[in-house]
């Protein structure tokens, strides 16, 4: 569970992610949005539904305490950024794989339920290793870029669209991480 916020723009943030994240992050976004929309744990906007028509189960509130879910649930501003990012992830999935992601309609449904705002988030949550989380010399965007680039598979995980790898996949990591 995470929102890999590599840029203030939800679209740019999605476009630079490796294939692995493009495939799995729309589902994680939908799980967070289901909590945001739920009556019990969120704002009571209504249920959002999976591709098969079944509503996401939110009665136990799974993931409600995750830093990214807490962040998304703090305001409509944050929730709308997540909707825009999830939609951008789905569009990127279509761009790379030539088909529609199974979560796309769920993201659209959440977008219809959550009250719209044009405002942008003032801050973002970081859910990652301590060596990035507590580095006060970097912002959240850089922390996520370093976290992603620390994975040995990342540089080779842009097979669907080789034009998408970005310069941060070649960052020199601090010695304590290497």
Can you annotate each of these PLM segments?
Residues 149, 159-161:
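C-terminal accessory extensions appended to soluble enzyme cores
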